[in-house]
């Protein structure tokens, strides 16, 4: 067959180094050659019978030299190109592994490229790094350990590695077999780092973003104006649509109409039952120890469960594998110090971060009638070691403690409370082969809450909860469009719902002791999930989670009649099972990319929660922590959620817009009898009522991720309702955390020199409360009369936080330090968190509690709020 010549009219000389932009969409090879000949004034010579001229081609590039375009374009089809005098000769390649511009002919075999992504300065694994093969349109992201895997055709491939705040790294690799490629990325200047809350998965491929799921990187957390000048993980959550806090002085947060105990927060896979310090003003996570934070408030991947509303997975930093480093934050309310460095360079490292409160100086500002002792501390530590190219181990340890005691000179004296968190995790990563990755975890977590009942602190009411878990997770990268995840876990839980602890020989002090049964439970779990892309527009993420829950003795079980009176008592022997639950949890997400900048998502998920927090407190300082498992009386909480989302990038990807609607339905939802007694009550379950709940809402978010001015605006409209037989006359009423309108605004301005400024503003509809509908006289006393539950609301909550940071060092210096000024609640808004109706106002305008109720008092509502403006000046350093 005679050769075929395709040439331009003028047939000038070649210019293979000239750059072009090209956009081909299902063009045939023949049409592509015509286009290239016109663009570059090229003459192509080839045998038409030897080339797949009808094969469709989709290819995009921007400002690439013709030489590289030919490599990528022709190499994908096993075509060899050669420059011979004034023409480009094309022919099928018949040799393997040739140098130059040749690629293997025929149907190309697939090979797997896998490896890890690291920060070149610290050796820290980079989570969520984008790995893209641009000519093929294939891509993936690194997992929580920085690992990735891609199947690519044999031959020359261009792989781009990109991570927010780091320079892109591009590798041209001739793939002839399964290949391990680990890459170190270089951080850009801090002034240029983007501030963006990434939707999970690859932001270059909208079709794989999960509805309701977000990720906070370190770049985001660094710029948020945290309480008293310190970055705070829990405060950052309040800025996301669909997540709201209780208010000041509380660590409680609520996700899409779920209660606060329906949120699972983990540090390196170990659950933290109370993630707060100082009644929620600080989180238990020192910012120097946080590497990455995933937030799932939509459908959870099948590997996550145990809670009904959200999962927050925090990955602790691993420590600098290159050199020793120290950083710290010195402030008026708390100070922290972080040490990290290599144990063996590039092979093993450590990190230890500690924080201690410095609050006792505030006693000098108080009057002589009262004083308090309030302190907290926490320690985060992590060690990791590379055993081989395929094995790495991690050990994480966390402990934290809070204590609050207030003493007065009056007859009334409060002895105080304390709470402790302890968690540790041992993990082993193993790469079986380039497509199969495993992680095995052994973790322990416990939480204790103490209410002191005597001045010597030897008698106290104590509740606790803890778990011990063994789990294994496997990830099988079948191909770039299909990833299979599966695993199992076995967990043992122990819960003490509240008993009095005494030291030997102590007097009774007129405190009645009633033994409350403790709980022991086991959970067995297997799960399987699949992340799949079908074509260029459709993505699926589906799976199933199969948990089994069992309760074991010893225990004393109480059974109640319809009037909640005890009708039977059963004593269960040790290690005897008395309740078993099995609850399959299907999850599915479907995504459709409408075009290159917009996509739609829909999801359905079922979650089951076997362990629940019992509390009828209405304020943040009165909560008694009681955790109880599902059993003969308490049924597992089951939640079904559907979501629909729309995602858009516009203005050349300078702005991101998301809109999501959701509906959740809760079965076996716990409610409480009026004036329920949960304090060392052996008949605790008789105070509970069970019904249904539902929530629905719309969440909007607009982000500007890059430039000197960055930030986002979030708005949520939502409602949360409860309906329980025997409560509120069986009619529906708003949940205690129902808040129809929530607005969050965050702005950050970086001068790219030494100054940076940030601000956030939060607005929430006031929390529902139950107010008296009238008062009546009984035996000379004024008694409030209550109507429907949650028939009123506190005033709306809003707060402005401001922060300014001045960099003391010149750019490029190893020793970096700065001063920051933060104003929490900058305009001094008094945001009430509780209201009471037991006081009257005297002639001088003072609010007093009547010494006796046999008087003509006009009771008035009074509220309690946290102090107004809270300023802080902090000094931060790092070297």
Residue positions per predicted region:
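C-terminal beta-signal and adjacent terminal beta-strands/loops
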Residues: 754, 763-779, 797-799, 805-879
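Periplasmic N-terminal accessory/gating domains of Gram-negative outer-membrane beta-barrel systems
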Residues: 138, 165-167, 194-300, 311, ...
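Surface-exposed extracellular loop regions of Gram-negative outer-membrane beta-barrel proteins
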Residues: 448, 494-508, 512, 550-564, ...
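Gram-negative outer-membrane beta-barrel transporters
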Residues: 662-665, 684-773
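Short, acidic, small-residue-rich periplasmic hinge/interaction motif at the N-terminus
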Residues: 33, 39-40, 77, 83-134, ...
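Short, acidic Ser/Thr/Gly-rich low-complexity loop/linker segments typical of extracellular
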Residues: 136-147
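Signature of Gram-negative outer-membrane beta-barrel scaffolds
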Residues: 490-598, 610, 621, 727
């Amino acid at each position: 067959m005679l050769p075929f010549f395709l040439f331009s009219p003028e047939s000038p000389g070649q210019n293979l180094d000239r750059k072009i932009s090209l956009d081909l969409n299902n063009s045939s090879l023949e049409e592509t050659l015509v286009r290239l000949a016109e663009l570059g004034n090229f003459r192509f010579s080839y045998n038409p019978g030897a080339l797949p001229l009808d094969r469709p081609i989709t290819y995009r590039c921007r400002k690439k030299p013709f030489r590289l375009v030919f490599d990528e374009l022709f190499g994908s089809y096993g075509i060899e190109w050669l420059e011979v005098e004034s023409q480009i000769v094309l022919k099928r390649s018949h040799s393997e592994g040739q140098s130059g511009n040749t690629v293997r002919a025929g149907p190309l075999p697939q090979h797997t490229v896998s490896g890890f992504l690291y920060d070149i300065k610290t050796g820290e694994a980079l989570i969520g790094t984008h790995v893209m093969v641009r000519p093929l349109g294939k891509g993936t992201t690194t997992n929580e350990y920085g690992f990735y895997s891609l199947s690519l055709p044999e031959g020359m491939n261009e792989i781009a590695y990109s991570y927010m705040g780091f320079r892109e790294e591009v590798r041209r690799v001739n793939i002839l077999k399964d290949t391990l490629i680990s890459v170190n990325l270089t951080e850009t200047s801090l002034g240029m780092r983007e501030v963006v809350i990434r939707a999970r998965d690859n932001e270059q491929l909208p079709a794989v973003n999960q509805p309701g799921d977000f990720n906070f990187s370190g770049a985001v957390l660094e710029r948020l104006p945290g309480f008293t000048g310190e970055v705070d993980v829990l405060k950052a959550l309040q800025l996301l649509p669909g997540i709201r806090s209780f208010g000041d002085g509380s660590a409680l947060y609520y996700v899409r109409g779920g209660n606060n105990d329906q949120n699972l927060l983990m540090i390196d896979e170990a659950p933290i039952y109370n993630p707060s310090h100082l009644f929620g003003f600080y989180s238990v996570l020192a910012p120097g120890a946080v590497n990455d934070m995933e937030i799932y408030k939509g459908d959870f991947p099948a590997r996550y469960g145990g809670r009904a509303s959200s999962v927050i997975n925090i990955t602790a930093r691993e420590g600098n594998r290159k050199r020793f480093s120290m950083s710290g934050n010195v402030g008026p309310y708390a100070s922290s110090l972080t040490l990290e460095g290599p144990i063996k360079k590039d092979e093993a490292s450590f990190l230890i971060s500690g924080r201690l409160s410095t609050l006792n100086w505030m006693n000098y500002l108080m009057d002589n009638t009262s004083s308090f002792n309030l302190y907290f501390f926490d320690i985060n530590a992590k060690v990791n070691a590379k055993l081989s190219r395929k094995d790495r181990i991690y050990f994480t340890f966390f402990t934290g403690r809070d204590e609050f005691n207030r003493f007065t000179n009056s007859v009334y004296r409060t002895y105080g409370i304390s709470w402790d968190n302890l968690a540790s995790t041992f993990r082993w990563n193993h790469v079986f082969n380039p497509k199969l990755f495993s992680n095995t975890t052994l973790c322990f977590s416990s939480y204790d809450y103490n209410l002191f009942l005597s001045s010597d602190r030897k008698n106290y009411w104590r509740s606790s909860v803890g778990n011990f878990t063994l789990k294994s997770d496997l990830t099988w990268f079948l191909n770039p469009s299909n990833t299979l995840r599966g695993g199992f876990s076995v967990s043992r839980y122990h819960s003490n719902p509240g008993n009095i602890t005494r030291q030997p020989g102590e007097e009774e002090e007129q405190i009645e002791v009633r033994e409350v049964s403790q709980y022991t439970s086991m959970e067995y779990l297997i799960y399987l999930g699949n992340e799949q892309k079908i074509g260029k527009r459709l993505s699926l993420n589906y799976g199933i989670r199969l948990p089994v829950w069992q309760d074991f003795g010893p225990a004393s079980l109480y059974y109640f009649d319809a009037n909640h009176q005890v009708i039977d008592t059963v004593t269960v022997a040790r290690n005897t099972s008395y309740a078993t639950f099995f609850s399959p949890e299907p999850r599915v997400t479907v995504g459709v990319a409408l075009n290159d900048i917009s996509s739609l998502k829909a999801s359905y998920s079922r979650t089951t929660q076997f362990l629940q927090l019992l509390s009828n407190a209405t304020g943040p300082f009165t909560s008694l922590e009681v955790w109880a498992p599902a059993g003969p009386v308490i049924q597992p909480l089951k939640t079904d959620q559907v979501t629909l989302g729309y995602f858009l990038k516009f203005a050349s990807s300078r702005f991101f817009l998301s809109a999501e609607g959701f509906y959740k339905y809760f079965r076996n939802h716990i409610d409480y009898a009026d004036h329920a007694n949960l304090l060392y009550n052996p008949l605790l379950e008789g105070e509970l009522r069970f019904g249904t709940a539902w929530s629905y809402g719309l969440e909007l978010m607009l982000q500007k991720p890059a430039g000197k001015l960055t930030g986002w605006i979030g708005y949520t409209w939502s409602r949360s309702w409860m309906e329980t037989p025997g409560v509120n006359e069986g009619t529906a009423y708003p949940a205690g955390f129902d808040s129809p309108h929530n607005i969050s605004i965050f702005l950050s301005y970086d001068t790219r020199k030494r100054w940076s400024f940030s601000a956030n503003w939060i607005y929430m509809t006031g929390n529902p409360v139950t107010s008296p509908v009238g008062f009546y006289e009984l035996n000379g006393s004024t008694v409030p009369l209550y109507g429907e539950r949650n028939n009123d609301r506190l005033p709306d909550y809003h707060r402005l936080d401001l922060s300014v940071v001045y960099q003391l060092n010149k750019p490029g210096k190893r020793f970096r330090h700065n001063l920051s000024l933060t104003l929490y609640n900058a305009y001094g808004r008094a945001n009430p968190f509780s209201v009471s109706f037991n006081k009257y106002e005297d002639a001088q305008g003072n609010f007093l509690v009547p010494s006796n109720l046999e008087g003509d008092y006009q009771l008035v509502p009074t509220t309690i709020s946290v102090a107004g403006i809270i300023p802080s000046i902090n000094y931060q350093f790092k070297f």
